[in-house]
């Protein structure tokens, strides 16, 4: 009976379904993170060896087919997220977690710097039990570094991922708002400018 209820829920609201997409190639896995504005987070992951593809979008919300304007209204519950396709033989998931923690302040609720709103929350959205376990272990280890501050990162199963509008994709690599392209070359460690 319980199974019937959950399937009818997912039929009426696809946003609540798990992310059932498949990576583009065999042997690749998905990872999904939220760490504030997705532009800089995406560029950081683009530079990682073993990351084959990145895309920014909206996840963990309750509205089907959201857009940027809607999620900024604060009514959809979505996070600005990045979905990564990676080769775990080249780049272990634990490496992605390390970069995730280094890219933002996981102790600020629903904000990163001047960006404020639930869409800027911190989250790790896992695709399998191994990712869930590694995410929890990494949070426990990271919490020891923040002795007097509580980490507010949510760790949840990945819900349906809605790809953001095309102008958001690889935004900083394409030049951002100021037309200053930033390198997405593997291994690049140039500072990331948030708006281009």
Swiss-Prot record:
The UniProt keywords, alphabetically, are:
Oxidoreductase
Any one GO molecular-function label of the UniProt entry: peptide-methionine (S)-S-oxide reductase activity
**EC number(s) given by UniProt:** 1.8.4.11
Q: Lineage from the top down?
A: Eukaryota, Viridiplantae, Streptophyta, Embryophyta, Tracheophyta
Pfam families in alphabetical order: PMSR
Region annotation (Disordered) ranges:
1-23
Recorded hits in InterPro entries, A to Z, give: Met_Sox_Rdtase_MsrA_dom, Met_Sox_Rdtase_MsrA_sf, MsrA_MetSO_reductase
What are its GO cellular component terms?
cytoplasm
What are the GO BP annotations of this UniProt entry?
cellular response to oxidative stress
Function, as annotated: Has an important function as a repair enzyme for proteins that have been inactivated by oxidation. Catalyzes the reversible oxidation-reduction of methionine sulfoxide in proteins to methionine.
Give the source's domain of life in one word: Eukaryota
Segments of skewed composition (Polar residues): 1-14
What family does the database annotate? Answer: Belongs to the MsrA Met sulfoxide reductase family.
Q: Which NCBIfam families match?
A: msrA (TIGR00401)
Q: Which reaction does it catalyse?
A: L-methionyl-[protein] + [thioredoxin]-disulfide + H2O = L-methionyl-(S)-S-oxide-[protein] + [thioredoxin]-dithiol; [thioredoxin]-disulfide + L-methionine + H2O = L-methionine (S)-S-oxide + [thioredoxin]-dithiol
Q: Enzyme group, top EC level?
A: oxidoreductase
UniProt xrefs under HAMAP family: MsrA
The protein's name in its UniProt record? Peptide methionine sulfoxide reductase
